[in-house]
């Protein structure tokens, strides 16, 4: 007699499916061990639980004792976590509604906001890269100011963290943009609420500067240490709604010789930023530099850190010159179509480009 065996019930199949996609980063491991697992390709609990401790130790470059403890934790999580995963599932309609209702930070350039779906979205990591002088730091300062626009004026009423690795942050420039932002808010309030006095906007430029937490980072070790400290800092300052790193690549291009280790460290850093974005519902903006890349027989400009880093961010925006005008191009996004928009940098900050805008050597 031929035995076909019992077919698994739908509930068992659903449990197996849920278990297989449980992320490895949920395991209670040290950041270095977690980074080694993910770098070795062990991103799901099912992939960890299916290998021996010796294979895991070899692939992830860890000791066999560490591999054994990881396997034990993975098996426990598979058994205990599958039911909670199923109970916590979302349907696609709820996910779409959540995506559309995400708070966004305006760039003060409506054309740029339009291609971004309303602005820089919270709960995402957005990379913005381009050549020197294109306005990356200007965008970073603009976002650190605009995140503070009160909710009554359509903003988030939050605070900003600005991590400066290059020394390019200019407090005088931040004050200029803050003064323009306050003037715009007063005009908006006077227009939308004519029965109120326009001076009811209580925020002053000095208040905006006080709400920008500035960190100067002078080495990659300081950068790693600061990123590790961010979760605690934001927990104590829950109004923070944007984290800007200007730039993410500077110290890793200058001082890091071990490319494999650099990739692992940056991947671990990207995971931490993603976790912060989701946990605190804030926007993470990573400014990036460009480098030359040999492709199809010629050297071409490309964002630094290569293709592997490009998968570490939710959205990628590339800034470039077209004649005398600055343009932003959506190069990668799971929810936004590829599109480009022009913008200009004025004394008041980012604005829509006009026919008279020319390339100004102000940065």
Swiss-Prot record:
Give the organism the record lists.
Answer: Arabidopsis thaliana
Q: Which GO terms describe its molecular function?
A: ATP binding; ATP-dependent DNA damage sensor activity; DNA binding
Q: In which tissues is it expressed?
A: Detected in various tissues. More expressed in reproductive tissues than in vegetative tissues, with the highest level in young flower buds.
Q: Which GO terms describe its biological process?
A: DNA recombination; DNA repair
What name is this protein filed under? DNA repair protein RAD51 homolog 3
The UniProt subunit note reads as follows: Homodimer. Interacts with XRCC3.
Q: Which gene encodes it?
A: RAD51C
**What are the alphabetically sorted keywords of the record?**
ATP-binding, DNA damage, DNA recombination, DNA repair, DNA-binding, Nucleotide-binding, Nucleus
In terms of one coarse class, where is the protein primarily found?
A: nucleus
State what this protein does: Involved in the homologous recombination repair (HRR) pathway of double-stranded DNA breaks arising during DNA replication or induced by DNA-damaging agents.
Q: Which Pfam families match?
A: Rad51
Q: Which InterPro entries match?
A: DNA_recomb/repair_Rad51_C (IPR013632), DNA_recomb/repair_RecA-like (IPR016467), DNA_repair_Rad51/TF_NusA_a-hlx (IPR010995), HR_Repair_Mediator (IPR052093), P-loop_NTPase (IPR027417), RecA_ATP-bd (IPR020588)
Subcellular compartments:
Nucleus
**Which amino acids does the record list as binding ATP?**
130-137
Its GO CC terms? nucleus
Q: Family, per the entry?
A: Belongs to the RecA family. RAD51 subfamily.
Its induction note reads:
By genotoxic stress and by DNA damage.
